[in-house]
Amino acid sequence: MAADLETAKRECVVTRAAEELLTGYERPIVLMKRRIGGKAATSVAPDNPYIGVILPYAPLQLLLFSYNDGLHMPDLLVMTSANRSGMPICRTDEEVRTDLPGLCDLILSHDRDILLRVDDSVVTLFEEEPYMIRRSRGYAPLPIYVNGDFHGTVLSAGGELKNTVCLAKDNLFYLSPHIGDVGCVRTETAQHECAVRLRDLLEITPQCGAADIHPAYESSQLVKQA
């Protein structure tokens, strides 16, 4: 996370299209070519010519860089989601204490509960056009319009890896935020909660479902339950 656009330009080659993504209201992580001589540690994405950069999008993140408390805060911070690999993002203090011991020194809590998990979106550029790698915060569940003669409602459960569910009504396809790999009970629960939330939010009852043909996949079970 860079404190501002100038910091991002110091670390990466920021094209006009990349700048529009970085400063847009969606505020995704943008993969860009790193500059030689930047201040980012070589241990950040080692042996990779690209790094993902995001600008602050929440008040707390702005305060990390600008709060006048006498402490000098670097203008570039390593940022990651509050979860272990293969697990959903922690949503409660108890989940943080259970899942992240040894990974963080301090926990900032609040009396306002987190109701919905959502990852940062990840975008790169191909010929100066946005290319979505992970469609989540800022983009989901905004619909994608698909040309064709489509009628009815469908729930698509996605695969076991890098999972996302989709609820379609006629030509509008509503993708959920990124869920992740479905391989444990908690991730399966998160997938189910996400599908129910999408259904209730859009007031769409699926008439049929689409899933991987493997009967043991949790995504297949989700469609059967729906």
Question: What is the role of each PLM region?
Answer:
Residues 1-226:
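Active-site-adjacent structural elements in enzyme catalytic cores
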